[in-house]
Amino acid sequence: SMSLFPEAMSNDIRKRDDTDYRYQFVHIPKNSVYHYFENMDMNDETNMVYLNSYGYDWCNLQADEVKAVGRYEVTIKLPPVPRSGTYELRYRVLANGDRGVVQFYFGDNKNFMQPTGIPVDLTIGCRHQSTGWEDDTEDLDYNAEVDKRMRNNNRMKGAEAIANSGGSARKSSNSHIVRHILLRQHIDANKTYYLRLKSVLDSDRKELYMD
């Protein structure tokens, strides 16, 4: 997700190969203090931190992640699509009990955005009964049927990618990784779109997670 914010690279924050503590936990200021990322807005109740473990070779994509706690509301300017057409917007999360429940909004006017559906519980991984998940088998046709069932529930397994553990993010050992399909719709290549992530919980300790 940090690739959406050029300042993270130009200011030597992202992918910094340094194990010094101050470079591993970088706090992002609120907009009212200093608008650090041009492509991101956050409310005053958002406490955001960038966790950089590039020097430790974390299993996260590019060995980093972004987290926020508080009664957060974060709006992100999305990059353009290459051509107009029907696209899916997906949100990948490593689910655990520390995560929160998020309402997503999407639109081309960040002052008037529509919810993408019901709030998403980030504590729920692939094994939850609502997803339709089953572990991959040797039968590729059956695996495709399971994938289709999950897509009907707006879920996907982790990506078919190599992890530090030497396997795929689709493996049963990685079933806490889930991709949520937030929407499928026509996207105009000539428009700018935004995604808003807003906590719907009273708790200010549950996490927003972006990898």
Where do the PLM segments sit?
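Extracytoplasmic
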Residues: 1-211
